[in-house]
Amino acid sequence: MATAATEEPFPFHGLLPKKETGAASFLCRYPEYDGRGVLIAVLDTGVDPGAPGMQVTTDGKPKIVDIIDTTGSGDVNTATEVEPKDGEIVGLSGRVLKIPASWTNPSGKYHIGIKNGYDFYPKALKERIQKERKEKIWDPVHRVALAEACRKQEEFDVANNGSSQANKLIKEELQSQVELLNSFEKKYSDPGPVYDCLVWHDGEVWRACIDSNEDGDLSKSTVLRNYKEAQEYGSFGTAEMLNYSVNIYDDGNLLSIVTSGGAHGTHVASIAAGHFPEEPERNGVAPGAQILSIKIGDTRLSTMETGTGLIRAMIEVINHKCDLVNYSYGEATHWPNSGRICEVINEAVWKHNIIYVSSAGNNGPCLSTVGCPGGTTSSVIGVGAYVSPDMMVAEYSLREKLPANQYTWSSRGPSADGALGVSISAPGGAIASVPNWTLRGTQLMNGTSMSSPNACGGIALILSGLKANNIDYTVHSVRRALENTAVKADNIEVFAQGHGIIQVDKAYDYLVQNTSFANKLGFTVTVGNNRGIYLRDPVQVAAPSDHGVGIEPVFPENTENSEKISLQLHLALTSNSSWVQCPSHLELMNQCRHINIRVDPRGLREGLHYTEVCGYDIASPNAGPLFRVPITAVIAAKVNESSHYDLAFTDVHFKPGQIRRHFIEVPEGATWAEVTVCSCSSEVSAKFVLHAVQLVKQRAYRSHEFYKFCSLPEKGTLTEAFPVLGGKAIEFCIARWWASLSDVNIDYTISFHGIVCTAPQLNIHASEGINRFDVQSSLKYEDLAPCITLKNWVQTLRPVSAKTKPLGSRDVLPNNRQLYEMVLTYNFHQPKSGEVTPSCPLLCELLYESEFDSQLWIIFDQNKRQMGSGDAYPHQYSLKLEKGDYTIRLQIRHEQISDLERLKDLPFIVSHRLSNTLSLDIHENHSFALLGKKKSSNLTLPPKYNQPFFVTSLPDDKIPKGAGPGCYLAGSLTLSKTELGKKADVIPVHYYLIPPPTKTKNGSKDKEKDSEKEKDLKEEFTEALRDLKIQWMTKLDSSDIYNELKETYPNYLPLYVARLHQLDAEKERMKRLNEIVDAANAVISHIDQTALAVYIAMKTDPRPDAATIKNDMDKQKSTLVDALCRKGCALADHLLHTQAQDGAISTDAEGKEEEGESPLDSLAETFWETTKWTDLFDNKVLTFAYKHALVNKMYGRGLKFATKLVEEKPTKENWKNCIQLMKLLGWTHCASFTENWLPIMYPPDYCVF
């Protein structure tokens, strides 16, 4: 057998399938129609120009004509202009950049910017580089530093047993070094490479250079022009292998660094048009076609598509006069064939004759799971994913060939408005090229993302032949050829494969033979606001129904009016189903004609039924239908009380890839269903997909969807639960995984349960005290254990500013239609470290269907550092924030300024995850709730029985810090006692907050008034005048006022405190250090330290005015510590200044004070005195402790205090102090990483959208 296997030729044809679609036979017939002359726009994650097969076409042209990033994720603000001095400029990173003499720059001006590599590195590359940098750059050096620090500590401990103050500090120093190194290891965070960017005009074109080596020597970096000008690209290094190109906009003020955001786009392009001159068996479907790479997957959003990216992409597609678009992206949409993005796509297709091919989606096997735009937009050809036996052997290495099938996950039609959804199918898997940064040449990927470029490449072959023979075509004629010649697989349902598997050769022949004007037309089919007839819910199929259907011709752009006038089509209408009646003929001219179709589903058996009313031109009936009216009817099974609302299926046989659909009328009052699957096989484990979908008008299928991929062991059992809506049909689909081998038998049961709450969402206002809700067990006996859990507090924000302006050159639609942006700014405070989820309620969950071009928010800290971003789907963009103040900038784009101005006061919300969940008390009657007595526990409700419950308000001390009026707590109510019921039947809860109660402060002002003697007006005036003079003393910098007050009030402590603060805050503070020391001594001398120490030692103060005394003593202690620290800082600054000048601290007589004590001794005395009263890590003491360590050259202790200062006040200056100490300690690796963080943490401005 081994010999036979080695002699059998390798199935290369199955790696990137072409036989199944007729592409291989087409190329055998017409080898020169291999895509030449065809330009395919690949809208994806970007294409790597250095990837295998992405260099040239079969006729020697550049494979990629241009590479564009339309998302903005690679944009660099280069508006800052500088001129070199002595051939050097200082980049925004702080590095000195050496300008090569060979560069030509007539103006002498350079635009500079900065970009963190991790901002545009693909996620997988970023993770790999982070791991490699830690292993190669950090770990070896850090291990040596840590070992050395531990060794020094051990040696000191062995050699020194004494506990003198000096030894104590040295021991603390060595211990600090070890602790810091351990801490740095735990907190290790790689900032990644930070690149300086330069842009300049050489007199002819704009050029850019990125300091990819991060060393400032630009002679070693690549100078690039816009990619389209010379197909130039660079690489970020042999470790990264990340290729990049550039585009320069806005007169050099904006640089776009274009990289691939993932491997997906290159793989897609390779399937469609990869070319390997030396290995033709690896070619894509259309190796002669050229590629326009457009990155629409935003790296900031994990390569999620955005409205900005898509609309800019369509502008580029039109400007480059592309023939085809491949779009292997898509999302579920709330309403099909609508929205701003879809409008722009329609314009490109209808007005510019651009064929738009897209993936149908990977959300099967249930019906109506097609994505947008592939399966929901009339102008787009949606492609399903098919797998052939050859693919199973070559790509997936299956032990045996299975019959051809649709992949289990391939999305199915119809769309929610009745359109078929899937147009055609193509092979949905391939082993093809991927970007170099993956360190792989090829990779297996599957999905409708792969079927779409396979079909797109096939269409490129057709267009190549048509162009070579000067045969006119339209998007309508090409689509009709594809659909009318596709081959239907008998074992695959129409909603999965659409019209069938694309046949390139037959479609080409069709277009050559059918060149009539009628064939070039499109036809819009409307059924009210829908595009087909889709009867799904029980009420829709209970009786016959009549449907008015509009048929209207769509002419290609620039059609002559005379041709429109002469249009006269004689159409025959046919239907092959007895349950549909339609007219036999229709005369169609240049207007919308209406016909009536009657659908009578009463005699249909349970299950799914599909048919079409087709319109044929009687002049050429063999050309196939000019249009189709899709009709779908679902007859749902009923469950009732006699079966306990259960459906059971026993010993059901499943072949590999087999799907069984069950349409069930959900009983009124049902709120969740449970499905139990049991394997009957004792030999075979089986992989199944359990999928359920209910459709609700203007809600995407995902809103009421359950999906579970499960592996069922031999004789194993699985139970799952999911929510349902009563009174509507549900599709429950159980599918054997497409690649499973061997047959298997299973039993499965679907059981419905219902606990109905009076409100679909529970809204509780704290001011009401007690809130009531009622519950009913609708179907059967149910065990209840009601529980309300609150997990988030939600903060509502209003914008502090809203600015509207026109966008740049990339944002102009055809006919000079300028796009505009509104940027709204919001501020909020994060009271403590935690997870937040920002969102814009008005626009969230809307992408393709939104009436606005796009939405994108970016959150910044108070230093303008970007912390995170998000767009239409907020649940995908939660992030962790530390305590502090933050700014959110929200960009909304549209063509009309007036529509943007309506949003100038748009609210925005930030949902904060609670560190500990909160619960509300629930009672079974009002009196228990009112008195806070017995809480509700478990109870059993009989069918149709109603039970009220009463919820009490949350105690005020449980309200999270920062939450207040205008905020609410969000959580859920579960009613069932069972775990499955708790998981499936969940009711949202909003708890609205009110102002907190007013709290009285400790100590009463009335008591103070009673205990004090009434002051006469003269005494009050004297004190007020004194305090006024003290206030002005600090402003006027006058010693005269101070001396005058000191004579009058020699024992008034606030006077001396004010003088100390005045001197310590002066601009020329360094010149008055001795005065600061004297002022601090004056403050200290006026505090009775003995009395203060005695008071602090007291455990309890029984005196009636204890609160007042405590307040006074706390102030005295705070003042004492403050004075000691200011004195210590002044002494330390004096010594550090002396050290900087002389290189050492003088301890001789010249440096002594009049009393005979040296500044160093005075500093030590002050330090140890301070430690008596407070901890060195107290916020007020940190600066003194830090400077004391510096004076004593104990850089470990200094760094420990400096890092604490950074935590309390993360300024750039504090970070620089840390870096300096790291260098003094010899920890250059720590210093280097920290230095790289600085331009990231403290950018010059907000990053661009």
UniProtKB/Swiss-Prot annotation:
Span list, region Disordered: 998-1018
Name recorded for this polypeptide: Tripeptidyl-peptidase 2
Active site (catalytic residues): 44 (charge relay system), 264 (charge relay system), 449 (charge relay system)
This protein's encoding gene: TPP2
Keywords tagged on the record: Acetylation, Aminopeptidase, Cytoplasm, Disease variant, Hydrolase, Nucleus, Phosphoprotein, Protease, Serine protease
Disulfides per UniProt: none
GO molecular function: aminopeptidase activity; endopeptidase activity; identical protein binding; serine-type endopeptidase activity; tripeptidyl-peptidase activity
Function in brief: Cytosolic tripeptidyl-peptidase that releases N-terminal tripeptides from polypeptides and is a component of the proteolytic cascade acting downstream of the 26S proteasome in the ubiquitin-proteasome pathway. It plays an important role in intracellular amino acid homeostasis. Stimulates adipogenesis.
Outcome recorded upon mutating residue 676 to I: Found in a patient diagnosed with multiple sclerosis; uncertain significance
Miscellaneous section: The limitation of proteolytic products to tripeptides is achieved by tailoring the size of the substrate-binding cleft: the two negatively charged residues Glu-305 and Glu-331 that are blocking position P4 limit the number of residues that can be accommodated in the binding cleft and thus create a molecular ruler. At the same time, they orient substrates so that the tripeptides are removed exclusively from the N-terminus.
Modified residues (N6-acetyllysine): 401
GO cellular component terms, A-Z: cytoplasm; cytosol; nuclear body; nucleoplasm
Signal peptide: none
Species in which this protein is naturally found: Homo sapiens (Human)
Pfam families per record: Peptidase_S8 (PF00082), TPPII (PF12580), TPPII_C (PF12583), TPPII_GBD (PF21316), TPPII_Ig-like-1 (PF21223)
Enzyme class: hydrolase
Catalysed reaction, written as an equation: Release of an N-terminal tripeptide from a polypeptide
Residue list for modification Phosphoserine: 915
Related illness: Immunodeficiency 78 with autoimmunity and developmental delay: An autosomal recessive disorder characterized by immune dysregulation, increased susceptibility to bacterial, viral and fungal infections, recurrent sinopulmonary or skin infections, and autoimmune abnormalities including hemolytic anemia and autoimmune cytopenias. Patients also have global developmental delay with speech delay and variable intellectual disability. Disease onset is in infancy or early childhood.
Compartments where located: Cytoplasm; Nucleus
Record keyword DNA damage present: no
